Every structure is written in C-alpha cells, then in structure tokens.
From Swiss-Prot:
MF (Gene Ontology): cadherin binding
Protein name: SH3 domain-containing protein Dlish
Localisation: Cytoplasm; Cytoplasm, Cell cortex
Organism of derivation: Drosophila melanogaster (Fruit fly)
InterPro entries listed in its UniProt record: NADPH_Oxidase/PX-Domain, SH3-like_dom_sf, SH3_domain
GO CC entries: apical cortex; apicolateral plasma membrane; cilium; cytoplasm; subapical part of cell
Function: Required for the apical cell cortex localization, total cellular level and full activity of dachs.
C-alpha cells in the first residue's frame, strides 16, 4: 500500500465580517490561541503578525526531511534539506516561513525536524546514507480526496475513532536511519581523476592519496583529502595504498636482480673480448685465479650463459678469494674460453708430487 501524506482539513475560508471578527477575537491585550483555519484567515494573519513582531525564536528553526508538494492553496512547497521557521502548529500541521524564499504556508509536522539533530543532518546531506534513507515516493504527495470531500471524511473520523488512531499511527511512522559513522579505515591512492557533480561529491586527481572514512555504500566511499576536505568519490576510482607499496617493492626487487644479472653478463662479455683468439700462456691464465682440475663431468642445467659445461680432467681457473655464491665457483674454462658457475665440490687444485 502506497504511503500517502496526511490531509489537513480546512474550514471554509469565507471573508469574515467586522461582526464576526469582533466575535472571534478576545478582548484587547489577551490574544487567543484559536484554531488555525487557513493562511488567509483572520486568526492566521493576526498570529503571523505577532510572531514576526516578537521575532523568530531559535527553537523555531527546522529542517525539512522530505519533499512536499502542496495539495491546496494555503500549503507551501518545500524540498528536503530546506531551512524553515515554524510560526505555530495546528495538530499534525505547522505554519512555516522559508528562510531563503520567505514564502509562507502549511506543511506536515512530521516532515520537519529541529536543527542539529540526527534526522536534520541526514536531510541536509542528501546522500547520507544513500541506501538507508530512501527518498519518499512521489505518490505520497497526492491528496487522498478533493477539497469538497474533506468535510465528509472529518465526520467519518468522528464516528470511527479507532480508524482515526490507526491512520494517525501510520502517518507518524518515519523511515529508520542509522548514524553515518566516519572513522579512518585506510589510505588509498586515486586511480582516475574525478570531478564533483553533486553537492556532497569531492573532486580528486589521479595519483593523490586520500583517507577513507566510510564504506557503507559499496559504490561510493566518503573520503578525506590531505587538505581536510571530505566528500563522496566512486569506490572504483581508488585503490588501497598498502597494496600499491607492496607491488612497488616487488617491482624494485625484480629490477635490482635484473640489473645485477645484466652487469654480470656485461662483465663476462668484456672479459671474453679481451682474451686472445688463440691459446693463452700459463702466466696469463693465472691472472684468472687459482688453477683447478675437474674431478667429474658437469653439464649446464640452464640454457643461459651463467653455467659452464666441463668434463673430467679439464683445467679451469677460479679466484677462490672472491666467490659470492655458496657451493658454487665462478670459473674460467680455457678450453671453451667461457666463464660460468660450476659446483664447488667438482674441482680441486692438482696434486703436486715430488720427483
């Protein structure tokens, strides 16, 4: 069943004669608080004049919770989040004056709340929260009956008080709202530039670091920039900064390893270019390190140039004082004129025998 706004029963607004005015108004100095019958009635005009003369009290300032479309001529159209001042109240209706527009008229009392309250703050920030405070459907502002039939409804309510109580309870039901909590929940980096389009959106630039304060809406996050400004940005436009740092560290480690390998290969190539094309003398070979002899055959397991393939009995040369990899020797094989790694246990200095 659609939720319909309460219908305020108006009395007939006939022009009051001087006699009726004198009859309705009390003696001078004691102004009565009679029932309001419309924005153009004598009582209404007198009450408005008194309120304006004495000034609007701070307690009269209210915030509109829902959009309201007038059904009759003495009602006022208001929008959610608009500020108004209440001049007086009649049952479920209040006569208000807009702070900006200065227009006056009736709105339902349940459609407004005092300033600096939870409901008022949610109404001012139209997006807070997006899912938990859905806007009222348009059908709620459609009048139940025409103006001519309102008197008949009033008579029916007098005969059936139980029905009136149930309707009143239904009209007082307000949507449930939870507090909009803002707590730091991690730093993020902006992946794409976003330009604010709504009053609660926040413009951010690509590469900027922000702090996430609320993630209740899966599509929009409430964030804070480094300058303290807060607002909504699309959730898909930001990414956790911690994950980015981990990726950057991994990439830096890989780049460092690639650099070391490239330097090793360049050093190997430069040494090979400096070697003579023919065989080297014994004195020249000793510049490559200690003379060793292979005890076993070894075949390189990787297709790159970091390992040597040698056979048992081959002579190799290695600088035993400058080895960085445990269990391996960086050696030079004169037979193949190449540098590479061989297992340390596969070679040893040749045995010297006395004659």
């Amino acid at each position: 069943m659609a939720f319909l706004c309460p219908v305020r029963m108006r009395r007939d607004k006939k022009k009051a004669t001087n006699a009726s005015i004198e009859r309705d108004l009390p003696a001078v100095g004691v102004l009565g608080m009679g029932r309001i019958t419309g924005s153009s009635s004598i009582e209404t005009l007198v009450r408005v004049g008194i309120e304006k003369e004495h000034g609007l009290s701070p307690d009269s300032k209210m915030v509109v919770l829902h959009d309201f479309t007038p059904c009759v001529d003495d009602e006022l159209e208001v929008k959610r989040g608009q500020l108004v001042n209440i001049l007086y109240r009649e049952n479920d209706w209040v006569y208000v004056i807009g702070q900006d527009s200065r227009q006056e008229g009736f709105i339902p009392f349940s459609y407004c709340a005092p300033c600096n309250t939870q409901l008022a703050d949610l109404a001012v920030k139209k997006k807070l929260p997006r899912e938990q405070c859905p806007e009222q459907p348009i059908e709620e502002n459609i009048p139940l009956l025409g103006t001519d039939n309102k008197l008949d409804v009033l008579c029916d309510e007098t005969l059936n008080p139980g029905s009136a109580n149930s309707i009143e309870n239904t009209l007082l039901v307000e949507p449930e709202c939870t507090p909009f909590v803002k707590e730091p929940s991690g730093r993020c980096i902006v992946l794409y530039t976003f330009i604010a389009r709504d009053e609660n959106d926040l413009s951010v630039e690509r590469g900027e670091f922000v702090t996430v304060l609320n993630r209740e809406d899966p599509d929009w996050f409430w964030i804070m920039r480094s300058d303290g400004q807060e607002g909504f940005v699309p959730a898909s436009f930001i990414y956790p900064a911690d994950s980015v740092r981990v990726l950057q560290q991994q990439k830096a480690t890989l780049n460092a390893m690639e650099t070391i390998l490239q330097q090793g290969q360049q050093g190997q190539q430069s040494q090979q270019q400096q070697q003579p094309q023919l065989g080297l003398g014994t004195d020249d070979l000793r510049y490559h390190g200690t003379e060793l002899v292979m005890l076993y055959d070894y075949k390189a397991q990787a297709p790159d140039d970091l390992y040597l393939s040698v056979r048992r009995g081959d002579w190799i040369y290695a600088d035993l004082t400058n080895q960085t990899v445990d269990g391996w020797l960086w050696a030079y094989a004169p037979k193949t004129r190449k540098y590479g790694f061989i297992p340390k246990a596969y070679a040893r200095p040749p045995a010297m025998t006395s004659l």
